[in-house]
């Protein structure tokens, strides 16, 4: 009996620690892949909406032919979506401000629907001038942030994403890498930043929701310890 009581106990923390690191890395990869395909899908859907006004971010035949001159645009949108979706929850943790506003999938789906609606409005509704279009889309985009986000980090990242994405797209156009199908370039520039801002908020909400599973696992392990 004494010998049995004297048996050394195995450390219990090494296993969960390794499991936690492994699950974190795997969770990160899975979230990135999911966000990538969501971004590609939304890029194709939004391009179909813009075709109604003959203003597209890439030629329409990119959907039917992988050998299109702008075949790389949807994968770039997917990559950007993955980066944005992973960046939002990372920024929340870094700032110590966990996002708790409307954290459920139904809210995320409504956010996606509103984002698609904003894009549809830019393609379908006829505005008197480009300034009216810009102000309307800006109000709708800020309304999307206020309704589904309301975080300072979300707003700041959205503005930064809109500025950077608009700058990159304009540089690509000026250098002839690709061009818009619409001759009215001022019209495109009037709605592009608002769409990028709303898209950043939308992908950020999706990324935050996907990250909730990992947060729940970490919380459960901390309670067990």
Swiss-Prot record:
Keywords of the record: Cholesterol metabolism, Endoplasmic reticulum, Lipid metabolism, Lipid-binding, Membrane, Steroid metabolism, Sterol metabolism, Transmembrane, Transmembrane helix
TM region positions: 29-51, 71-88, 104-126, 130-148, 154-175, 190-207
Subcellular location: Endoplasmic reticulum membrane
Site (Required for the recognition of 25-hydroxycholesterol): 115
Lumenal side: 52-70, 127-129, 176-189
InterPro entries in the cross-refs: INSIG_fam
Domain of life (superkingdom): Eukaryota
Recorded topology in the membrane: Multi-pass membrane protein
One GO CC annotation: endoplasmic reticulum
Keyword Cell membrane: no
GO biological process: cellular response to insulin stimulus; cholesterol biosynthetic process; SREBP signaling pathway; SREBP-SCAP complex retention in endoplasmic reticulum
Single Gene Ontology MF annotation: oxysterol binding
KxHxx, short sequence motif: residues: 219-225
Residues on Cytoplasmic side: 1-28, 89-103, 149-153, 208-225
Role this protein plays: Oxysterol-binding protein that mediates feedback control of cholesterol synthesis by controlling both endoplasmic reticulum to Golgi transport of SCAP and degradation of HMGCR. Acts as a negative regulator of cholesterol biosynthesis by mediating the retention of the SCAP-SREBP complex in the endoplasmic reticulum, thereby blocking the processing of sterol regulatory element-binding proteins (SREBPs).
Domain notes: Binds oxysterols in a pocket within their transmembrane domains and interacts with SCAP via transmembrane domains 3 and 4. The KxHxx motif mediates association with the coatomer complex.
Name of protein: Insulin-induced gene 2 protein
Gene this chain is encoded by: INSIG2
